[in-house]
Amino acid sequence: MSSDTEEASEEIEGNQNQHVNKQPENDDKMDIVEDEETPEEPIENDPNYMSKHHSVFQKFKSSVHDVKGEEVDEETPEEKEDIEMQDLVPLPQPELPRDKRLVSTAAHLNNLDWLTTPIYTAPEETKPFAEFQNPPLSSLMIKNLRNMGFESAFSVQISVLNLMLKDIERNRLQPDMRGDLLVNASTGSGKTLAYSIPIIESLQTVKVPRVRAIILVPTKPLINQVKTTLNQLSKGTNLSIVSLKNDLSIKEEGIKLQTNEPDIIVSTPGRLVDHLTNGYISLKNLQYLVIDEADRLLNQSFQNWCQILISKIDEFTNIKERNISNSWKLNVQKMIFSATLTTDAGKLSLLKFHKPRLIIVNNKEQLVNEMFSLPATLNEFKLQFGSAKSSLKPLILSKFLLSKNKLANVLIFTKSNDASLRLSRLLSLIMNKLGSETINIAYINSTNNTTSVRSKILKDFSKQTINILVATDLIARGIDILSITDVINYDLPNSSREYVHRVGRTARANQEGFAYNFCFGKGEAKWFKKLMAQVGRSEKNIEELELDTKQLIEDNDESMYKESLDELQQQVFNRA
């Protein structure tokens, strides 16, 4: 460092010492405290010293500046890196955050995820009834099931029983735990047994007859079918089961109900509402309400049956004053079953669900955003023909049945009463001319739907006395004939819902079945594609079945077909 700098430093230090010595002795303690609390201010910031020793400070600062400059100069300058030139391109941007799946409001409302979390179960699952545990089925129930020919439960029955048997056990001490049940399962999956078994299990020990369960179905044949099942399951118990029909007047039937009050009622909604409004049925002790084929019942008003029924139930469940006698009253447990369960929030809200649980008999990965499901054992086929061949439609059907050996256990659906009557007669004439005189073909529609005639036709069909049955959508629901192997949609249905119920007449109880769909022209092909877009399938898809009409129809077939048409016309004129 230079001599000028050393001089300036010595002079500053001397002045500092003189300044310290001039402090009065009385202020020593105060100065010590201040020094501890406040750091000493640098001398160069004191204006008094700066004015007295301005020149010395200037020399000191310039010397320090020179020394710093020399140190910097001694350092080796860093080499600049070569900058690689790039073309003008957009700057990279981070990925925009997106939902994993964006679903429209309409698609969201086409399922029931908004109501509750679905419980999925595989359609092919089975389990012996004797293996149900915690709690098990009663020995009497297992005995009755075996007498009916049932050893194992199907998928829908397993799912429902697993929940309902636990509810029955739990509700003996916790009556507030009951939750409603919605079940979407294909036709022929065993829904009737699924709700009948837990109801009988729960009520089999009751001593005093009271209306404790009501089962609603859309048609009279279903009433008979459900009542028969309940009677078989309740053998060995004292349960009273009745069905409400139009055989008696409301008054006569009402008097019988009051004289001998039943435990379980099977009815259509309209008939039940008539008895409720006339005061013949009390819902005070009601525990179970089952709505089978719920989509059809909710789509039809039946004198506002839903609002009336739920309001009558609420009269006894919405108790304003709790006391010892009603504190353990069970809520009415609702069970909703359908192969095409509606997703309409407006319709479902009328039922006022409590803690709902949803069971879907289908594979979760394969489920589409619709509540229409088909049996896993069903094989579907589409037969496409040109519109020019539509005039030969009955002949093509006849030749198809013969070529594929579909001559028994065949159910054919048409669009109207006239179409079913005409096709059944024409098929009989064509089959006779083709050498198949032994094939018995019958029809069933609203013109011959009396109880006796209908029962005889279905009985003969199940025994194969009738080989081919031509029908309308009247029997698309409610007939349970396990022997049906083939369903043919001669005329396409009006909706996906009707399609599901039509083809559900086969492939029942995990048996294999076949469905054939006849499409003539581009219009029918387009309509069929639209119908199928809303139907859920587990694994299989619809197969295109190619049929060469040139090979199928021989040279003399068209002339024979014309003769058959003439004979049919003559029969109609003779009947007229």
Curated annotation (Swiss-Prot):
Residues annotated as domain Helicase ATP-binding: 172-359
Signal peptide extent: none
UniProt GO MF annotations: ATP binding; ATP hydrolysis activity; RNA binding; RNA helicase activity
Residue window of motif DEAD box: 292-295
Region annotated Disordered, chain positions: 1-86
EC code: 3.6.4.13
Localization in the cell: Nucleus, Nucleolus
PROSITE patterns from the UniProt entry: DEAD_ATP_HELICASE, HELICASE_ATP_BIND_1, HELICASE_CTER, Q_MOTIF
Biased composition (Acidic residues): 1-13, 33-44, 71-85
Reaction(s) catalysed (UniProt annotation): ATP + H2O = ADP + phosphate + H(+)
Location, primary (coarse class): nucleus
Assembly behavior: Associated with pre-ribosomal particles.
Domain notes: The Q motif is unique to and characteristic of the DEAD box family of RNA helicases and controls ATP binding and hydrolysis.
Similarity comment: Belongs to the DEAD box helicase family. DDX51/DBP6 subfamily.
Listed name of the protein: ATP-dependent RNA helicase DBP6
Organism: Debaryomyces hansenii (strain ATCC 36239 / CBS 767 / BCRC 21394 / JCM 1990 / NBRC 0083 / IGC 2968) (Yeast)
Chain's gene name: DBP6
